[in-house]
Amino acid sequence: MLVGLIVERASGQPYARFLTERILAPLGLAATSVGGPPPEPAARGYRDGAPVTPFDLAAMAGTGDIWSTAADLARFTAALHAGNLITNESLHAMLTPHAPIEDDDEDLTTTGYGYGMFTGTFAGHAAYYHPGDNPGYLSFAGWIPDLSASLVILANDESVVIPDLLRKLLPAALGES
C-alpha cells in the first residue's frame, strides 16, 4: 500500500489511473486492469475445492490489485527487463539481491530478494521472478535473461504448487523436452 500511496502523491493521480496511463496503455496491455475485483470474464478462484468470493482490492492500491493474462504478463516482463519501463540503474537495483535467501532445491533455486524480485536459477539458467496471490488465485512471472524469455503461470486454485508446475513446464519452456 505504501507504494500505491507514493505513486498517488507523486503523480497527483489515483494509482489505478497512473498505472493504466503510464504503463498498461503504452505497452498495449489491454487485458490487464488495476483495482476492483477480477474483471469479467475472469476464471473463478478456488480454495479447497470451493469457489472463493472475489473482493474489491481498490482500497489497497499497490497490494496485489492488478488482474492480468499470461500474455500481458509476459509482455510486461519482457518490457521491464529490456529497460523500457525504468532506468537501467533502477533495474539493476531491482535485480540485485539485497536480502540473501538459502535454498537447497537443485532445479529451482532462490538466492536472494532484490527490490520486488526474487533472484535464482531455473534448471541452471539465471532467473528473476515475482510470485503473487489473491484469494483463490496464484501467479508467477519470471524472466530468464540468457534466453530473453518470460515464463508466466496463472492458477485459479490455491492448491496449485507453483514450484512443482515449474519443474514440469521448464523443460518444454527451455526447448529441452
Explain the meaning of each model-derived region.
Residues 1-135:
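Short, surface-exposed loop or secondary-structure junction motifs
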Residues 3, 129-130, 138-157:
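Short, well-ordered beta-strand elements
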Residues 29, 41-44, 153, 166, ...:
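A generic alpha-helix propensity feature with a strong bias for hydrophobic helices
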Residues 61, 136-138, 159-162:
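A short local loop/turn or secondary-structure capping micro-motif enriched for an aromatic residue
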Residues 87, 135-136, 147-149, 170-175:
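Short, low-complexity, polar/charged sequence segments that are solvent-exposed and flexible
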Residues 99-102, 156-177:
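Short, gly/Ser/Thr-rich active-site loops of penicillin-recognizing serine hydrolases
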